[in-house]
Amino acid sequence: MATFKDACYHYKKLNKLNSLVLKLGANDEWRPAPVTKYKGWCLDCCQYTNLTYCRGCALYHVCQWCSQYNRCFLDEEPHLLRMRTFKDVVTKEDIEGLLTMYETLFPINEKLVNKFINSVKQRKCRNEYLLEWYNHLLMPITLQALTINLEDNVYYIFGYYDCMEHENQTPFQFINLLEKYDKLLLDDRNFHRMSHLPVILQQEYALRYFSKSRFLSKGKKRLSRSDFSDSLMEDRHSPTSLMQVVRNCISIHINDCEWNKACTLIVDARNYISIMNSSYTEHYSVSQRCKLFTKYKFGIVSRLVKPNYIFSSHESCALNVHNCKWCQINNHYKVWEDFRLRKIYNNVMDFIRALVKSNGNVGHCSSQESVYKYIPDLFLICKTEKWNEAVEMLFNYLEPVDINGTEYVLLDYEVNWEVRGLVMQNMDGKVPRILNMNDTKKILSAMIFDWFDTRYMRETPMTTSTTNQLRTLNKRNELIDEYDLELSDVE
């Protein structure tokens, strides 16, 4: 029983403004929609159901019915979902604007209640006040919201969400923003609304209000790769495959500084209708480049590593070894379709082998060495502590020699031309014969930073940017990378 959805259905019949604002895909004729994947709350109609991906941000936050309108909480167009979305910092004045919007769209007074009661009492069997017939009158005004942290912004999507105890498979978490407002003032608003209802309905209204206004906020979730759909890109493993984003916009671009003021637009109904009549869509092609996707890719690579290669004498690079059960890697995995990962894997393994061979370790492919367990971690550059520990364990395994208080290892084994170029690039134009710990870290990190410079990388994909940010980046031609030309981050 989706209270918010029912309220939108009944209240949109009140006037022209409501018919425009409260139009939901969930209340309209169903159209073919993408397959649903996760359980959670649709941000558009607030019902708990199976969710599909949003074409505006690639997150799973819309049901298959509401997906037909392609609404995203990051849109510029001030539709109902966008007007219910606030950014930190939320002030008391912002909340007043939200509550005023609720009162405007979902009023409760004696005249309106009688109108709804008369429309329900069509037959004698409907003389009772059954909750399912009056569900739309039982939506209290609360500061219940779903929250998500994207880059440096925290978003709050206010609404009335039923079934809070159900399983949540999305990155959005429930938060109670009552502490940002006056508890007694909110109580007074709801008691006034409730006073116009029949006694039986008052009891249910009060129960719903207190359960949705006095709950404890839950801890924020960390985003993961699985929270984003692959459906917006042709090939998730190709660096040249872009994510296709659709955003709803209006002719009068609203500054992000005024983000929380969107809900105040409906105060002037004529102006709001005029703004909505100027709505249009903007399409963007954006890069996949972000830390979240990078961590995921390197996580797969680290699980596929064949560390025995660093003791081998194979003439071919690490990914091209055949007929060796200790060194041959399964290169049929989709992750190897990314040429950047192939280059990084081959170069890192070649450099480590050169260090091992240079420092007197006369092993073989079949050797079982203690250092093997640290080799996969050398690709987890986003996990700084783990990566540093792996480099240090490798360096110590090479039995460095102390020279004037600094430990050094040799580098006199042949490396391929690409590795040689990277070493020279990071070591003042020459290939040194000895390396200390910092030199080793510098070279190993440079091999990864050449293609995935995580030091200057967004945490989440650009699909989570606001429409204004996308527009600005597009003007600077910074939405896509030059990987189709095989130009690295450094180049």
Curated annotation (Swiss-Prot):
Annotated region (Zinc-binding domain), positions in chain: 42-79
The name this protein goes by in its record: Non-structural protein 1
Predominant place of localization: host cell
Matches recorded under InterPro entries: Rotavirus_NSP1 (IPR002148)
Molecular function in Gene Ontology: metal ion binding; RNA binding
Region annotated Important for cytoskeleton localization, chain positions: 82-176
Compartments (UniProt record): Host cytoplasm, Host cytoskeleton
Any one Gene Ontology BP term: symbiont-mediated suppression of host cytoplasmic pattern recognition receptor signaling pathway via inhibition of IRF7 activity
Family, per entry: Belongs to the rotavirus NSP1 family.
Domain of life: Viruses
Annotated motif pLxIS motif, positions: 485-488
Subunit structure: Interacts (via C-terminus) with host IRF3; this interaction leads to IRF3 degradation. Interacts with host IRF7; this interaction leads to IRF7 degradation. Interacts with host CUL1 and CUL3.
Gene Ontology CC, one term: host cell cytoplasm
